[in-house]
Amino acid sequence: MDGSWLSSEAIEVSKTRLNRTGYFETVDVTTENVGATDDTVSVNTKVKERPTGSISGGIGIGTDSGLTIQASISQNNLFGWGTRANITSYENDYRKHMEIGYTDPYFTVDNVSLGGRLYLDKYDGDDDEDVVDYTNHTCGATFNLGYPISETWFVNYNLGIEKSKIKNNGTRFEQSDVFFNMYSKDPTRSVNFLDYKLGFDITHNSLDKGVFPTSGNKQTVSLTATTPNSDMHYYKATAETYHYFPIDLYHEYVFTVRGRIGYGNGYRSKNGVREILPFFDNFSLGGSEWMRGFSRNSIGPRALYKYPIIDAYYESSTSVGGNAFWTATAEFVIPTPLVAEAYKSSVRSAVFFDAGALWDTRSKMYTVDYSDPGKYRTSVGFALTWMSPMGPLSFNIAKAIKKYDGDDTQQFNFNIGSSF
């Protein structure tokens, strides 16, 4: 503010705030004397803008799942107001997903945020495609309201409505039989569910940058539950943490650790039996973010299919997810070779180690016991991300180290897009 005392601490806070937006590649703040006296200075801020909009696409290659295609259009600084908008789609042989979202993080002068999203998801499984054999068509809407409670703490509330249409395709499996029997529904016919969801999350963020942070930490705790007037009654809770430790003075070498845990279950009884987290809303593990080296949604408890003649189930190689998980990652960020000084702020290279487990605590309900949290997977690899003038481009090369029969491994994954 004009006429106020100069504070080096306040200058650093302002610089960090600008970096956290993710809108700028570099932020430099300098001071210079004003006029003939040396008791008045001017604070000057020089920034190099980063492209905040993107049109991107991605291709994943898996040993069993084949090609996965995704595309998105997003703008994180719409009209220069700091608002965020996106259109995202994801498609493979058995799933189609599309969503539209909009958030205004500066809805009021006190930084209260307001936003929402609409989504449509169609899952058409087929046991010949090595995915769980059922159909689930879902559409819904979510509205959120958030506000800061301090410089580094932020609270967000959300309200959602979701309609689902579910049925077995023909090959019965035990997880779906248990679910449909609980609600006295015929699994061979389409069943409709209407659920209202309430959510809450709290975030602490002391990272130095919004893109490619090199120091600080970030934690988020989230809870989502269906309301008592919904057709199903369950909750899901997650917690995640990120930590960045610079090794050298220039933050070219950075050690990073991150972790995530989750748990979900039912909270009421139906026909004398406690409800469960629906099998189609289970947690999943595998993919380019948390468990590299394994294809998306490819590890964890398996679908237990029913023999066509006898009244018994057998274990398949198809993952159906679980109601509890943990993941942990260690990364060592290193300078990228052959990159000019002018582009170093836009490129990040790292070697990584990923580990994680996905299990089901409701072992007494099923023929096979999947309740062991110690049945984990691990992988190692190299990751490269470039915020190029043509858009974000990332590569992951990974090797699954500890794996189990039926796991769908993915040695290579890349995403490419164009920015505006």
What is each residue range found by the language model?
Residues 2-5, 368:
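C-terminal soluble interaction/assembly domains
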Residues 282-288, 292, 362-420:
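C-terminal beta-signal and terminal closure region of outer-membrane beta-barrel proteins
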Residues 104, 245, 334, 388-391:
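Hydrophobic alpha-helix-in-membranes signature
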Residues 20, 54, 172-346, 351-355, ...:
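C-terminal outer-membrane beta-barrel translocator/porin domains of Gram-negative envelope proteins
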